């Protein structure tokens, strides 16, 4: 007896057809469990390319649910991701100036979400702007009705604060499909008569040794890796070049042998995080998808090995 079910899919960067198939399988299962509203959650940086996968999956879910309209907003103000006049900001800069333009798999070169989404879908895309949101749920509902009458299928929604998300929430009551980052979720529980729970604060403290596994190449993660190293804590880099030559298993074993005696003294860091020029050089040799998969599989093996060493408190940053 639960109020919400999360199905975690690795569908962000796989071929669009596979992402659609996985998402539709998840939808069928959720419908069989009695789900009343489907929430297609994606990253607050709207990671995608003109091929997808946000647009194609959204379209497929809309078709399967028989709905002609949904919203799209990755806004997550608590994490500095806001949408204003349809443009996505990361902190105080446009997304395409934030470092996300250098993402190794989904470089984001345009912060205009209406344009980005329109490139990925055949349905018309429009905007519910900040002025409409500020007037509350009824005005938002009226704007939705007007857009539907115009033949719009997807509306990007402005949100610069949690207050905006809480105003948006009631307007989404009864909408078969919501697509968004995780931020929009804060405005939905009240639609189902749910109140904040103390359950999370009652969970037992985590146990086990501590480790960080980092594969993200974002500006923020590069800075975090540099900070961790500056504190003097043990850190070991995984070289994509070493993995390229069929040495993945040997590299993983080397990392675990290094980490084993250190874990008892505090957290260790294993990272493949690199500057954009390094990433591009590896991609040029291997191809974008192959380079990502190579590092991903190595880090997964490292994470499993760390868990076997009682590194049961893992912080995983991308990859």
Show the residue positions of the predicted features.
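Cap/lid and interdomain-hinge subdomains that line or gate substrate/regulatory clefts
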Residues: 3, 15-19, 24-165
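Residue-level preference for the first positions of well-ordered beta-strands
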Residues: 3-6, 37, 69-71, 152-156, ...
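Short beta-strand segments
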Residues: 6-10, 41, 71-75, 156-160, ...
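Glycine-rich phosphate/pyrophosphate-binding loop regions near the starts of catalytic domains
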Residues: 8-19, 228
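Short amphipathic alpha-helices and their capping/turn segments at secondary-structure boundaries
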Residues: 27, 61-69, 252-266
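Short, well-ordered secondary-structure micro-motifs
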Residues: 82-84, 191, 248, 280-283
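Conserved, well-structured core segments that form the ligand-binding/active-site neighborhood
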Residues: 91-255
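C-terminal structural cap/anchor segments
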Residues: 257-317
């Amino acid at each position: 007896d639960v109020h919400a079910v999360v199905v975690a899919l690795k569908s962000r960067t796989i071929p669009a057809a596979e992402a659609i198939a996985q998402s539709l399988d998840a939808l069928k299962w959720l419908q069989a469990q009695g789900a009343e509203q489907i929430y297609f959650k994606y990253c607050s940086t709207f990671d995608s390319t003109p091929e997808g996968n946000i647009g194609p999956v959204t379209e497929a879910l809309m078709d399967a649910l028989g709905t002609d309209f949904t919203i799209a907003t990755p806004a997550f103000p608590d994490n500095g991701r806001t949408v204003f006049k349809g443009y996505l900001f990361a902190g105080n800069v446009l997304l395409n100036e934030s470092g996300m333009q250098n993402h190794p798999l989904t470089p984001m070169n345009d912060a205009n979400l209406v344009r980005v989404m329109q490139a990925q879908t055949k349905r018309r895309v429009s905007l519910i702007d900040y002025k409409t949101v500020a007037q509350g749920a009824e005005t938002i509902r009226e704007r939705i009705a007007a857009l539907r009458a115009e033949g719009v299928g997807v509306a990007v929604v402005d949100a610069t604060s949690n207050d905006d998300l809480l105003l948006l929430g009631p307007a989404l009551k009864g909408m078969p499909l919501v697509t968004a980052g995780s931020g929009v979720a804060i405005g939905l529980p009240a639609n189902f008569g749910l109140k904040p729970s103390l359950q999370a604060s009652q969970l037992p403290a985590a146990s086990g040794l501590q480790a960080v596994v980092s594969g993200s190449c974002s500006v923020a993660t590069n800075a975090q890796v540099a900070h961790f190293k500056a504190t003097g804590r043990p850190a070991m880099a995984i070289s994509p070049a070493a993995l390229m030559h069929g040495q993945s298993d040997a590299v993983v074993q080397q990392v675990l042998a290094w980490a084993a005696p250190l874990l008892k003294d505090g957290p260790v860091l294993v990272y493949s995080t690199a500057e954009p020029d390094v990433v591009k050089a590896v991609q040029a040799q291997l191809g974008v998808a192959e380079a990502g998969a190579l590092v991903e599989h190595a880090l997964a093996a490292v994470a499993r090995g760390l868990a076997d060493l009682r590194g049961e408190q893992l912080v995983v940053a991308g990859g």
